[in-house]
């Protein structure tokens, strides 16, 4: 048709060369962002720890909690009893309350250093604000407001299920070529673990340059 068209109305554009897919080897483990307010872990985080333990059995990996704040040591045992095998802990007075920039900066540094396979976060105001920034910075996809999570048995990738088209269908989304696989999960759709006081875990304390904790915005007041 192209050769026969005397008006040259038809063309075939050459496909642009595609970028090479990133190397996803070496990414391992499930991370849960442990959302805290006033030094107390929010219940959605415990729900995600419980679900993560189910997923971890299918992946043969650890579940780690990411805890950013200040004076949080009194919460550590409870976090381990409720499902965390490891806790990555970053504490400083400037991190007492959530702020987008420093929390994002810390998360990016931790991902670069430890390379998690999956990152889960509550679909809360804080969770949505933080994890979307992280995903954009590392150029991976993010499935929002999940109501179901599972592991595909053959390729061992995260199945992220969420309502779509106004809730008329349930869509299952996968991210086979990029790591970490990231999702936010709705509150009260997952079951927390029963606390097991015999569980043991590892605390990894991380310290970064103070410049990483600086925010261009100033928190004036928290209104409940």
PLM regions with names:
Residues 1-224:
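N-terminal glycine-rich FAD/FM-binding segment characteristic of electron-transfer flavoproteins
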